[in-house]
Amino acid sequence: MATLSFRNVKKTYAGNVPVIHGIDMDVADGEFIVIVGPSGCGKSTLMRMVAGLETVTEGEILIDDKVVNTLEPAERDIAMVFQNYALYPHMSVFDNMAYGLKIRRLPKDEIRKRVEAAAQILELGKLLDRRPRALSGGQRQRVAMGRAIVREPKVFLFDEPLSNLDAKLRVAMRLEILKLHRRLNTTSLYVTHDQVEAMTLAHRMVVMYQGVPEQIGTPMEVFEKPASTFVAGFIGSPPMNLLEVAVGGDGIVHTSDGIALDISPLAVPQQVRGRKVVMGLRPEHMLLNAQGLAAEIEMIETLGSEQLVHGRCGKHMVVVRCSTRQFSETPARVGDTLTIGPDGRHPLHWFEADTGRRVEGL
């Protein structure tokens, strides 16, 4: 196990194209960090720099307080699990898992001991003689993880390992990875674009946007107190409703197109009064037929136990996530107009209109 540190790490490609704008972060021994963000945000580039597959333009990456910028990948004592498994098709499961150890010229008895131990952890014991083509997608990914485990590295790197799996298998493999980490407690860095993976796996998550870490925190910190409108709109399904509003000195709120919101001034903090800001409301923290604003229903999504009600209020689209029972008590059809508003039990979110950052002190 090991610590992992980033000291003002930057990456610029040829032509002075910046990809990573400067990251400072410390990963504790045994911590599971998930880097999440949309395509092109720099998350995989950051992981590749840790692995030694990309050079660091500026700053330092340290493993156990040792700068590794100039070390070859093989010298960093890390193991990486890829999205596409990267298995040798002509080798058995055993040989795929043992290959890296053979290259390092470990004794045969030690190799067998490590492979069989990893196979037991991952429930691959009966599959060691099979070739990859005879395995399911989930089994192949477990072999890829087994190949990383047998190396007994200081740091695990996971590069979108579940992206090629179907939805049901992704859920199962998330649980496998959670159990694996609890058992091995190895420092881990995990890259994904999937917020569900980030929320369920991470001790802390790094939300990346355009090469910048927008927010670093525990999953619940990020969910309950997003640092920016980007984070608010990226974490949460459906994402947070964001409305451009003008707040009067008396706490009365109007949308940017002049529609009054029937919200108690007591729910409006002093920091936003007399200003133009962005107000955020989580869909699951809103109610139908509640004080707030009138919205015309444009679409209703039925998800079994839940309903997603999409309504338009002027230029803003607003989504309410409610139980099917609550929805049945408020029968509504597309084209109807309903009042929707906050449930009063959860605070509203407020962001700066110009920067998108969370209003300080809130």
From Swiss-Prot:
Record's keyword annotation contains Metal-binding: no
UniProt keyword list: ATP-binding, Cell inner membrane, Cell membrane, Membrane, Nucleotide-binding, Sugar transport, Translocase, Transport
One MF term in the entry's GO annotations: ATP binding
Subcellular location: Cell inner membrane
Domain of life, source organism: Bacteria
Function: Part of the ABC transporter complex UgpBAEC involved in sn-glycerol-3-phosphate (G3P) import. Responsible for energy coupling to the transport system.
Subunit structure: The complex is composed of two ATP-binding proteins (UgpC), two transmembrane proteins (UgpA and UgpE) and a solute-binding protein (UgpB).
Protein name, as recorded: sn-glycerol-3-phosphate import ATP-binding protein UgpC
Source organism of the structure: Bordetella bronchiseptica (strain ATCC BAA-588 / NCTC 13252 / RB50)
